[in-house]
Structure formats: structure tokens, C-alpha cells
Curated annotation (Swiss-Prot):
One Gene Ontology cellular component annotation held by this UniProt entry: cytosol
Family in the record: Belongs to the RRF family.
Regions annotated as coiled coil: none
Gene: frr
Name of the protein in its database record: Ribosome-recycling factor
Record GO biological process: cytoplasmic translational termination
Keywords for the protein's UniProt record, in alphabetical order: Cytoplasm, Protein biosynthesis
Transmembrane segment boundaries: none
Manganese among keywords: no
Subcellular localization(s) per the UniProt record: Cytoplasm
Keyword Cytoplasm: yes
InterPro entries reported in the protein's UniProt record: Ribosome_recyc_fac, Ribosome_recyc_fac_dom, RRF_sf
Biological role: Responsible for the release of ribosomes from messenger RNA at the termination of protein biosynthesis. May increase the efficiency of translation by recycling ribosomes from one round of translation to another.
Length: 186
């Protein structure tokens, strides 16, 4: 493995951790409806637990209401129960074969909790990025130790890896700040 490979792999892994972080952020509730909020809901389907998206179509009706359209008529009650029992604090209402999930307004205390959760997710993403930086730097040091790269190349590689790390950490900070704004907007 060359230094270029290490840098490329590290950046790709950092990009993957940012994507995972964005997915986790999408699940944090804001005052607005977001279909991704229900991604974590598991529904019993023929004896096994499956994600809601595999048994129903989830979409937005308006800024405060999510609609869930089961693909099978008999699934409505199970989907409603799964949403109600998820720890999202949502109360679905069945309207024939359509389930409406209104988003209750969040209290100030709940908003602060969600903001704290977003910050914690951000910290976790930063730690993941920093761990990837450490692993990359160790790989570069191993190349130098095995005489496959010079110390000058090591310094350059570590500086490049640090730049990539700084870029990804700045992206995490920006995403957290945007999510906090979204949560605190009434």
C-alpha cells in the first residue's frame, strides 16, 4: 500500500462516516415533519421485525404531517402500534387505509434535549474522523519504518491527512450548527 492509497482510503472512510452522521442527524426530531424520522421504526411482518419502509410508503402531507400508506390492508394496525411504541413521541391516526402521523409541537425543554443529542452525534462523528486520521498516520509511519517511504514523505502525508481531517470536522460542525438552528426554529 502506498501513501497515495492510504490518503485516498482515509478520505473515502471519512466521507462514509460523514454520510452515516448525516443519516443519524436526519433521525433527530425537529419541529418539522421528515420521513427519515420513521426509518428506525420496526414493524412485525409475518413473524419477523422489518423496517417500516419495507411494508409501507412514507411521505409528507405538509410541513407537520407524515403519511404512511401500508402496501397490505391488514398492516395498518401493526404499523400504527409500531409508531406509537417507538420512542419518538408520535401519535399516529388511522384514516381508512392511510395513517397520518402529525408532528406535535416541541416544548423548549424537548428542543434543548434534541440540540444536545445533535451535539453528541457530532462529537461521535468527530471522534470517528480523528480515529481514521490516527489509523492513517500509523499506516504511514509503518511504511517509513519498513523503508517504503522517506520521512519527508511522511511529514507531507501527515499534513495532507490533517487537512482532510480538518475539512471533515468543519463539515460536521456546520451540519450540527444547521441542525441546531432547525431544532430551535419555532
Amino acid at each position: 500500500m502506498t501513501i497515495a492509497d492510504i490518503k485516498k482510503n482515509t478520505e473515502a472512510k471519512m466521507d462514509q462516516s460523514i454520510v452515516a452522521f448525516k443519516n443519524n442527524l436526519a433521525k433527530i426530531r425537529t419541529g418539522r415533519a421528515n420521513p427519515a424520522l420513521l426509518d428506525s421504526v420496526q414493524v412485525e411482518y409475518y413473524g419477523s421485525m422489518v423496517p417500516l419502509s419495507q411494508v409501507a410508503n412514507v411521505s409528507l402531507i405538509d410541513a407537520r404531517t407524515i403519511s404512511v400508506q401500508p402496501w397490505e390492508k391488514g398492516m395498518g394496525a401493526k404499523i400504527e402500534k409500531a409508531i406509537r411504541e417507538s420512542e419518538l413521541g408520535l401519535n399516529p391516526a388511522s384514516m381508512g387505509d392511510l395513517i397520518r402521523v402529525p408532528m406535535p409541537p416541541m416544548s423548549e425543554e424537548r428542543r434543548k434535549e434534541m440540540t444536545k443529542l445533535a451535539r453528541n452525534e457530532g462529537e461521535g462523528a468527530k471522534v470517528a474522523v480523528r480515529n481514521l486520521r490516527r489509523d492513517a498516520n500509523e499506516s504511514v509511519k509503518k511504511l517509513v519504518k519498513d523503508k517504503l517511504a522517506s520521512e519527508d514523505e511522511q511529514k507531507r502525508a501527515e499534513a495532507d491527512i490533517q487537512k482532510v481531517t480538518d475539512k471533515h470536522i468543519a463539515e460536521v460542525d456546520a451540519l450540527v450548527a444547521a441542525k441546531e438552528q432547525e431544532i430551535m426554529a419555532v
